[in-house]
Amino acid sequence: MKRLTILGSTGSIGTQTLDIVRQNPEQLEVFALAAGKNVQEIELQAREFKPRIIGLMEEKAARELKQRVADLDIEVVSGMEGLLRTVTDEVPDTVVTAISGRIGLEPTMEALKVGKDIALANKETLVAGGDLVMGTAQRLGRTILPVDSEHSAIFQCLEEDPRTLDKIILTASGGPFRGWSEEQLQEVTPERALQHPNWAMGAKITIDSATMMNKGLEVIEAHHLFHMEYDQIDVLIHPQSVIHSMVQYCDGSVLAQCGRPDMRLPIQYALTYPTRWPNPFERLDLRGKTLTFFDPEDYDFPALKLAYACGKRGGTLPAVMNAANEVAVHAFLARRVAYLEIIGLVDKVCSEHDVLDATDLETILNADHWARIRTEELIHG
């Protein structure tokens, strides 16, 4: 029996993780759940999965939940302290970091320090603190298994000596606006941007997929997860989202991992590794399908170029880029900035940052804090 703490249990990845638990009650058990403030959803989860601890970031929401589940034997905690409580208890074996944004960095670090393995769906953790997180995991002998479909695909293809690896190829759908003119992009609304052609995801990651910032974040994540230089990480536009990623070896051989665009598959693999479990999910059928690929250079994706540049520069710059992007995306969703302003804001904040070595958590969090304040200042004008 594997016992889980699920951070971000009410979000897209979190609810799909619980679906995997639901399918495998003899192998998986929920020890703790954590979310932001969705009291109604997490109460339903509490009554079904009977966790021992629930953490909510918002204190008011935690108080309400405590009243709602008073008939259950559940400890309700709040804030970052509560979030850390869910990951540092001795009972859970694996922490699923499905929480959105840089906020996942601290609980990931604390979970590693107390000996937990990580099923990582929170790419911002490695973007902001990749060297620190991976160094901690390596030093303590802990495993970080990727949940992102692209990185799970790469992980599944890396069966040989890593010294024979030539490069990795991340695929991207290109989002809903590939090939659109600047005039068309000026009219993009949050509702339109939230209509991803292939994947069902949360709001923030869906906007990131439209701008291609999500792929930029994944490039930085891949750099840390697989210890690859940035010039060994390629991106290909693959609109059908059937091939999730590829690896190329030194002899020219290419291995690709294929599957339906269903996040439950990489989630399950991260929870069952190194074995595989059967499931009732719909299978991939390639009959009649045409698979196409395009160079992202054929389109204007400034976010992808910015992410490569920030990743190569390193230090605190990726954390600043990520923080500025989080603020800008939420401002777009709140109709405070236009779609085309998102990456411009991020670029401006990055250009103003005095980069430091990201050697400790405090330095990273300070850079993150500065970037959020500066982005808000630019939005307010």
From Swiss-Prot:
Domain of life: Bacteria
Binding site for NADPH: 10-13, 36-38, 122, 124, 202
Keyword rRNA-binding: no
Needed cofactors: Mg(2+); Mn(2+)
SUPFAM superfamilies the UniProt entry points to: 1-deoxy-D-xylulose-5-phosphate reductoisomerase, C-terminal domain, Glyceraldehyde-3-phosphate dehydrogenase-like, C-terminal domain, NAD(P)-binding Rossmann-fold domains
Keyword Disulfide bond: no
Enzyme class at the top of the EC tree: oxidoreductase
GO molecular function: 1-deoxy-D-xylulose-5-phosphate reductoisomerase activity; manganese ion binding; NADPH binding
UniProt keyword terms in alphabetical order: Isoprene biosynthesis, Manganese, Metal-binding, NADP, Oxidoreductase
Catalytic reaction(s) noted: 2-C-methyl-D-erythritol 4-phosphate + NADP(+) = 1-deoxy-D-xylulose 5-phosphate + NADPH + H(+)
InterPro entries per the UniProt record, alphabetical: DXP_reductoisomerase, DXP_reductoisomerase_C, DXP_reductoisomerase_N, DXPR_C, DXPR_C_sf, NAD(P)-bd_dom_sf
Residues where Mn(2+) binds: 148, 150, 218
Alphabetical GO biological process terms: isopentenyl diphosphate biosynthetic process, methylerythritol 4-phosphate pathway involved in terpenoid biosynthetic process
EC number assigned by the record: 1.1.1.267
Positions bound to 1-deoxy-D-xylulose 5-phosphate: 123, 149-150, 173, 196, 209, 214-215, 218
Pathway listed: Isoprenoid biosynthesis; isopentenyl diphosphate biosynthesis via DXP pathway; isopentenyl diphosphate from 1-deoxy-D-xylulose 5-phosphate: step 1/6
Function: Catalyzes the NADPH-dependent rearrangement and reduction of 1-deoxy-D-xylulose-5-phosphate (DXP) to 2-C-methyl-D-erythritol 4-phosphate (MEP).
Family: Belongs to the DXR family.
Entry-linked NCBIfam families: Dxr, PRK12464.1
Protein name according to UniProt: 1-deoxy-D-xylulose 5-phosphate reductoisomerase
Species of the source: Desulfitobacterium hafniense (strain Y51)
Lineage: Bacteria, Bacillati, Bacillota, Clostridia, Eubacteriales
Name of the gene: dxr
